[in-house]
Amino acid sequence: NSANPCCDPVTCKPRRGEHCVSGPCCRNCKFLNAGTICRYARGDDMNDYCTGVTSDCPRNPYKS
């Protein structure tokens, strides 16, 4: 949407020079650094971390 400063108002894709529009691993139109916690552990699960190359928060492979 045009209210998002990361979003091209016509295509709603990231503006030139920006990495992302939204997501748990996107802040200020840039991907968060690899290793940034994007989902905290619950119970026996482990934390999930940003990869530095996507705005998504991948699930760790050890999810119980």
From Swiss-Prot:
It is found in: Secreted. Expressed by the venom gland. A motif (Cell attachment site) lies at residues 42-44. Gene3D superfamilies: Disintegrin domain. Disulfide bonds join C6-C29, C20-C26, C25-C50, C38-C57. GO terms for molecular function: toxin activity. GO terms for cellular component: extracellular region. The keyword Ribosomal protein does not apply. Signal peptide: none annotated. InterPro entries: Disintegrin_CS, Disintegrin_dom, Disintegrin_dom_sf. It holds the Pfam family Disintegrin. Belongs to the venom metalloproteinase (M12B) family. P-II subfamily. P-IId sub-subfamily. Poor inhibitor of platelet aggregation. The disintegrin inhibits the adhesion of cells expressing the RGD-dependent integrin alpha-5/beta-1 (ITGA5/ITGB1) to immobilized fibronectin. Inhibition on alpha-IIb/beta-3 (ITGA2B/ITGB3) is low, and there is no inhibition on alpha-1/beta-1 (ITGA1/ITGB1), alpha-2/beta-1 (ITGA2/ITGB1) and alpha-6/beta-1 (ITGA6/ITGB1). This is Disintegrin VA6.
